[in-house]
Design a protein with these regions (language model features):
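N-terminal soluble domains immediately following signal/targeting peptides that reside
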Residues: 20-167
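Bacterial Sec-dependent N-terminal signal peptides
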Residues: 1-23
Length: 167
């Protein structure tokens, strides 16, 4: 299973790394895709890199730079802990444990990747997504779920965190 969350690029206007990010809006996108050939659920999360950096700094009482190679191993530790505490999935009534694959930064966006093994079919998926709700009450989380080529999507405005999809 791979989880994807993203923040829209090109919408960042910060004056310092310690100042809260200022965007016209705050958005993250999580994409969940059933890969039937590998029997995995792939999850990717895309978000603004500076928002992710700042919430990880706040939660872990440390100063980091998401672009710095020296901090990559720390982010590889903090990102899965953060995402797993804010993104919960249930497939056909069973809670899903997903493994962290890694992250990459591209311009203003951070992409975080996860995967759950041994999932060959999905009839129903229940999602609780509060990613970056602890960063701003302006947060919007968009979720895309793709099963057998059929895509369903929803938008969760703060404080709403739950979405249910049936296939």
């Amino acid at each position: 299973m791979v989880y994807t969350c993203w923040f829209a690029p090109g919408l960042i206007n910060t004056t310092s790394s310690t100042e809260a990010a200022k965007h016209p809006f705050y958005i993250a996108v999580t994409e969940i895709n059933l890969n039937t050939s590998d029997k995995t659920l792939e999850v990717s999360c895309k978000m603004f890199a500076d928002d992710l950096e700042q919430i990880i700094e706040k939660n872990n009482h440390t100063q980091l730079d998401i672009s710095a190679d020296k901090d990559k191993s720390k982010f590889d530790s903090y990102i899965p802990a953060y995402v797993k505490s804010h993104l919960n999935l249930s497939v056909d009534g069973k809670a899903i444990d997903f493994s962290y694959i890694g992250f990459e930064k591209e311009k203003e966006s951070a992409y975080c990747y996860f995967q759950a093994e041994n999932i060959s079919s999905v009839k129903k998926i229940d999602i609780n997504n509060s990613i970056l709700h602890d960063f701003t009450s302006d947060q919007i989380n968009i979720i895309h779920v793709i099963v057998n080529g059929k895509r369903q999507s929803t938008k969760l405005d703060y404080p709403n965190t739950t979405a249910n999809f049936s296939f």
